[in-house]
Amino acid sequence: MSRFDGRAADPGSYRDRRSEGAFGGGTRAFAPTSKADSAAAAADLDGLPRFEKNFYVESPSVAGMTEEEVEAYRRRREITVEGRDVPKPVREFRDVGFPEYVLQEITKAGFVEPTPIQSQGWPMALRGRDLIGIAETGSGKTLAYLLPAIVHVNAQPILAPGDGPIVLVLAPTRELAVQIQQEATKFGASSKIKSTCIYGGVPKGPQVRDLQKGVEIVIATPGRLIDMIESHHTNLRRVTYLVLDEADRMLDMGFEPQIKKIVSQIRPDRQTLYWSATWPKEVEQLARNFLFDPYKVIIGSEELKANHAISQHVEILSESQKYNKLVNLLEDIMDGSRILIFMDTKKGCDQITRQLRMDGWPALSIHGDKSQAERDWVLSEFKSGKSPIMTATDVAARGLDVKDVKYVINYDFPGSLEDYVHRIGRTGRAGAKGTAYTFFTAANARFAKDLINILEEAGQKVSPELANMGRGAPPPSSGHRDRYRGYGGGRSWS
């Protein structure tokens, strides 16, 4: 039995109260912006019912940890915390007090111990406080906010006709939104907590029907969610648990106005969890607008760095040499494992994929011009191993959760070091080892110094010619490059 109160602990508490009938839908679009309407909205908010959001009871095992033990544990797992009255981390799943059905799913998934972000993030989230989480992709952050969300829903009154969701998760891309929803379905099924995924590029009908039936958890991209609200298909009056996942990526994609519009329609006493892989000033400023007295947990460093489980190899070459180098590399590493190749443009993605297929390689491509059905099919073929080579633009760089990607190849160097780190982060997930290969040309020279910093921080070898580029020297001519092969990650890949 969980240590939470009865409603939060027992899956039957929500299951028994949850009707199978249709009762969702929306009755309220975005509020007008006049002062009179704003005042009316504030008065309306004052009449909203109270809700529960603090469910954490420290286990005897956690309570017994001394300050020295807490500090040693955080230091060993590279956990940095900020905030008032920060709870101690949990070292085992049973210390969290999750409902039994959640623990069963955790066991079934084969998890051995909480990841660092889960270890510290779960007690913070379950206390009902706002939370800033800074952790690299693949750190386990999705469950760090989803499992407390399930506990939160279980403690709330059931949805009534016309109610919108209780939990809202905003994500930058449909791929990430779909993956989050898959986890929500897996861990929420036993308590009849229902979720849906709202994103553009597909017909609205099935999404509208889900909203009208009533769902406790909505995972959405900002644009399609605004469309649904303004069309009166849902509302945000019941949202008391808000998650912004990959906030840095959403800002990169220009979603700040949409995020502000959405958040302005949610009651201010909500709980907000704000997740980002990096912490630039614009991400911090947005957090200041939305969060109150938050905890902050950082896994590793706020400085941009790559996963140390990834072996990084950088090859200096010319644009005209890339394709032959790619083929030579594939001949060397192809063993049936999944290989993800990143391009800068949709056109380049299609061209290289077409050439690879003509040369007999089992390659497919995914990018923003593909229909959702095409993208789903390509991902399915890649995940199953039927087509173990997938080329992609950055639409797949964030949040793409494909197990056992052994190799990432940056055919084109991305437009930022943040995207470089996120691209190569598709491999080396969940404690596995991975390998990333990067083609680096004279046109990328402005990134050399920062790339060297990332390589050195991760203990990777830096080639003399990349080091020279980092000092501002021009790249060597192609006729002199062979003697530098093999640097950048510690082994030859010629």
UniProtKB/Swiss-Prot annotation:
Sequence segments annotated as region (Disordered): 1-39, 465-494
InterPro entries: DEAD/DEAH_box_helicase_dom, Helicase_ATP-bd, Helicase_C-like, P-loop_NTPase, RNA-helicase_DEAD-box_CS, RNA_helicase_DEAD_Q_motif
All residue ranges annotated as the Helicase ATP-binding domain in the record: 122-297
Pfam families: DEAD (PF00270), Helicase_C (PF00271)
Enzyme superclass (EC): hydrolase
EC code(s) of this entry: 3.6.4.13
Low complexity biased stretches: 29-39
Start and end residues of each Helicase C-terminal domain: 325-470
Compartments, as annotated in UniProt: Nucleus
Reaction equations catalysed: ATP + H2O = ADP + phosphate + H(+)
One example GO MF annotation: RNA helicase activity
Amino acid composition bias (Basic and acidic residues), ranges on this chain: 1-20
DEAD box (motif): residue ranges: 245-248
Chain sites annotated for binding ATP: A135, E136, T137, G138, S139, G140, K141, T142
UniProt entry keywords in alphabetical sequence: ATP-binding, Helicase, Hydrolase, Nonsense-mediated mRNA decay, Nucleotide-binding, Nucleus, Ribosome biogenesis, RNA-binding, rRNA processing
Gene Ontology CC entries for this record: cytoplasm; nucleus; ribonucleoprotein complex
Source species, domain of life: Eukaryota
Gene Ontology annotations of biological process type: nuclear-transcribed mRNA catabolic process, nonsense-mediated decay; rRNA processing
Residue interval(s) of motif Q motif: 91-119
Keyword rRNA processing part of the UniProt annotation: yes
Keyword Metal-binding: no
Similarity field: Belongs to the DEAD box helicase family. DDX5/DBP2 subfamily.
Free-text note regarding domains: The Q motif is unique to and characteristic of the DEAD box family of RNA helicases and controls ATP binding and hydrolysis.
Record's function text: ATP-dependent RNA helicase involved nonsense-mediated mRNA decay and ribosome biogenesis through rRNA processing.
Record-given protein name: DEAD-box ATP-dependent RNA helicase 20
Lineage: Eukaryota, Viridiplantae, Streptophyta, Embryophyta, Tracheophyta
